[in-house]
Design a protein with these regions (language model features):
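Carbohydrate-interacting regions of secretory-pathway proteins
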Residues: 1-102
Length: 102
């Protein structure tokens, strides 16, 4: 999930709706986003059903199947896509491959 956590209109979301969360499953532990209009970094590592999300260098999700059995509903193969509901969002240096070193 990518979202401007600081926007007033998003202040009453469910925990799993904030930036970096595995949507509807694992909430990001911290709100580490920079202000809208500045670059943020996000690294997502999925190894089987182990999901790790680093936002601006901080580990905010470390979800395993033991803790979140709902991860079993996620496919292990398929397409990677970006979805946008209406706001402008920019991406750069998008890479897909083996996990980066910690």
């Amino acid at each position: 999930q990518i979202l401007d956590d600081h926007a007033e209109r998003y202040r009453e979301l469910k925990p799993w709706q904030y930036c970096g969360s595995v949507y509807k499953i694992a909430a990001s532990g911290k709100q580490t986003g920079r202000a809208a209009g500045t670059w943020n970094t996000m690294e997502i590592n999925c190894t089987g059903y182990h999901y790790q999300v680093r936002h601006n260098g901080i580990l905010i999700v470390n979800a395993t199947l033991d803790e979140f059995p709902e991860l079993m509903e996620r496919r292990l193969e398929g397409f990677l896509g970006f979805q946008n509901h209406s706001e402008e969002v920019w991406f750069h240096d998008v890479r897909v491959g083996l996990p980066l070193a910690p």
